[in-house]
Amino acid sequence: MAMPVLAANDEWYSYIKINDMTIILEKDQANIKVNYTIDPGTQLIVYLLGKQDLKNKLLKVLNYEDATVKNVEMNSAEIQINDISYDYGKGIYWFPEHEFNVVIPNLRVVSPQVSREYRNTKKFSDGMGFFDR
């Protein structure tokens, strides 16, 4: 069943509006926690028909290949991505720039050394280097 995309609003993807996202970097892996709102008119349909379409739409929003949905609820999800960072050896990693398919109102990227916060962005620009210790 195809669901129409809501009005031209960069924060919505179909029936999902992203509220905030946290990306926690650990070596070449990322654990992503995303909080969102489901359009009230669609909540019952998602509840009755299951969350597979919701999972697919969240993966489309993130725009990462080979992501794994670890947990999905009606207002949040946990997603894991392996091989997301470049490993330069000796505990040195590079998390490259990335573009999402919607505007993220509050994006937080956390490495073992630093936490960066972005507002109303569709792109994590410039990338970020970090160490595994």
Which residues fall in each region the model found?
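Lumenal/extracellular ectodomains and adaptor appendage modules
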Residues: M3-R133
